[in-house]
Amino acid sequence: MNKIKALLIISLALLLVWLPAQGTDINEYLSKEYPGQVVSVKVTKNKVKIKGIRPSGKGYYLSEVTPWEALDAQGLQDNLIRLCFKKFRRSVPRKIETGGIVYDRSLSRWAIVKADGEDVPVLCSHARYADEVAPVRVATEMPLTGKKGLGGYRLNKFADDIEKMDIRSVTINIHLNSLLYASEKPGSFLREYGGVKYWFDSTKVDYLDRVLSYCSDRGVITSAITLIDLKSADPELTPVFRHPDCDGGFYSMPNMTNPLSFNAYAAVLDFLADRYSSGEHGRINNWIIHNEVDYGIDWTNMGKQPYEAYMDAYEKSMRLNYNIARLYDQQTWTLGSYTHNWTVGENENGFPVRKMLEDHVRYSNAEGDFRWGVAQHPYPQDLNDPLFWIHDTGTTWSKDTKYLTFKNLEVIDEWIRRPEHFYKGETKRLLFLSENGTNSPSYSEEDLVNQAAGACWAWKKLSALPGIDGVQWHAWMDNRGEFGLKIGLRRFPDDEEAPGAEKPSWHVWQAAGTDKEDEVFAPYLKVIGLGDWSEIFHEVTD
């Protein structure tokens, strides 16, 4: 029996005690003012150094909360360190053996609890993540030099579109649990993480090398969309990666409920962050964590959960990704992925995007800030209908608009530029429109023209809004797997009449941001019913 199989048995047993509600009332926790405070957590090469102020009296301890633990009685009573002085400084080894793995404690949270004389430990501070970590590498700066991008980029016969259109950013999907195996397979190579051996697929890694190098060699910023497939490439790893409450959908929330699952997820993130930060194999500049989590029942599934439990799981996943990525690239951003449902849920299974964003701010205020940003998907209300400027009736310029689409991008621009939403109160967070496009219901001339008109509107608006850092038009080309939509800039690659042919929207996107923009865009003013592009802009109202 190999180590992963043995640990899997232990981990499955631990799942029996995992509760979705996770003990602590998250909303109360984020809002509460505690009597104690963990002031800072600094991680050196070999030590974790924690400073704080505990309440007066006796019986207080420093509690380490690992990523697979909750802020409940079980999570808070492990790894207690007595605090003798009101103002304290404690130093602990960075690496320990626990749960069958060699664990890097730079990934933990640290909280003050009162344990003596209590039936269960009582939380007396917010739990704080590491503020500073000694880097493994300092990546070379790679600036974003323009707003125009493509979504779902890959290497094919049209790969040079990024040069033809002067593309400055792309997204690529990375199916994390398709990359590695629990035991050696033909064409795999070994990498150890946390004392556990994993074997990575050489063919899949070679493709990532080639596509990421192609982009970085041309100065193109790449954001990796991290996805957990419902089934792993190695069946043995399916229950390791897949969340125990996942009951369907297209992708799963990662399983971080036990040491083995945490370690496997961290192992693949560490591999990618390490390999694609040096520049030798290309770069991953930013990370988009999972897909459209406000409608997770379809796109990042962990079953039907209370909002607080789902949000807490997603926050942990974002934190883990960032805390690993920053070891190798301190300029990286970790972006949350959201639909156009600004203040409404998709249905009873969906959550409002603005609420999730504001709760990310609350987590940062409570547990220490990190470089998180927003990957917004401002599709039209009806993804099939390109005429969003007419038919998006639930889309207004109010801060409380139901939907956020190309029509009213001013709303999220205003939100991201508020100082209270800045990273550490100083730096505007990165905002990408990372998946969005207008549809051509058919390849008729009228439908293609309407699609192109929508692309003109989108570019004119976003290029003028300073809070929006970039857009990745999705899809680059029409895709048979997208529910009949034709939102690409090119036709289906297997189209019978003109396979992969450029649509009018392709030429709009090529002209965007160039000296040909006004000439190419001008005919579409009449299509939309405008006299001038300035008419599309509106003030945001309360």
Predicted features along the sequence, with ranges:
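Short, compositionally biased P/S/T/A/G/V-rich stretches that sit at domain boundaries
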Residues: 23-43, 514
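Short, aromatic- and glycine-rich surface loops/edge beta-strands on solvent-exposed regions
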Residues: 104-121
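Substrate-binding cleft and catalytic face of glycoside hydrolase catalytic domains
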Residues: 168-345, 381-382, 478-483
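Aromatic-rich peripheral "rim/lid" segments of glycoside hydrolase catalytic domains that contact
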Residues: 298, 443-542
